[in-house]
Amino acid sequence: MRIGFLLLLLLCIAPVSYAQTVKTGPDPSTLRDPDLERDSYHNLEVARNYFKLKKAYVASLKRCEEIIAGNPNFAKIEEVLLMAGQSSLWLSQNKGKQRPDQYVSFEGGEKRTLTSEQFRSMGIDYLKKLINDYPNGTYTKQAQEELRQLDVPKQP
């Protein structure tokens, strides 16, 4: 009788203990490759150096674009988007020590440079992406201020 009771109790408790385990792992959007994060962080440091110290906005923009394309889940992507937006806007105004025509893109095996208006719209796009994707982010207010200075209407 006791053995039967213990067996019945064991059968009742066993499913409860299996229910305690996690079926899935962490959310895939939060998983980050450590090597990719390290590489992206290095590119961010170099972009900051170009941006703040050397006023080399073409080089800074290229580094930021590399991070955005290669690691969109980067932990500091907000700062990257702000720096890319500001670099683009300042290149459209011919600010900095590098000429805007040093920014070269290849499309269909053909080199092409961007006009001031293309740099401006690219900068606005980066800043709007920052504001829309990270509305409570640490760099959102700076992005809104940049857009306000350009008289760009707010999005809903």
In which residue ranges do the predicted regions lie?
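Acidic, polar-rich low-complexity tracts and alpha-helical solenoid repeat scaffolds
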Residues: 2-5, 16-156
